[in-house]
Amino acid sequence: MSEVPGPSVYELAGGMPAFERLVDAFYARVEDDELLRPMYPDDLEPGKTHLGWFLAQYWGGGQIYSDQRGHPRLRMRHAPFPITPQAALRWAELMAASIVEQGFPPEVERPLLEYVARATPTLINQLPDDVTDLTAGP
């Protein structure tokens, strides 16, 4: 007999309304952040919608992001933006604070925070100018 899977993180969190609140909390922090705000367009609403769709899909809320925007391709979609280690860390800090602020139960908060920690470094696409070029010969 096969085991019936339990509820998804999406369901445990409270569905789309919970992810919309999370995204609103995150973008409120971005709005006031001197490092990250310049990387975003003046109108934050489309980005909020897209992030909400992405998170909902990733955590088990159906194919809403893919249905609207195609495959997520995170690295490709973020390639135009200079994401330094400092910017990535700030993004992770703001997202983690937004997650914790929601008061999710541990079975929701833990995987969300683990995802942020795991995914954030993969989006770094620009090193600071003071980093030695490791491709240069001796």
Identify the residue ranges that each predicted region occupies.
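Core of compact, soluble alpha-helical bundle domains
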Residues: M1-P138
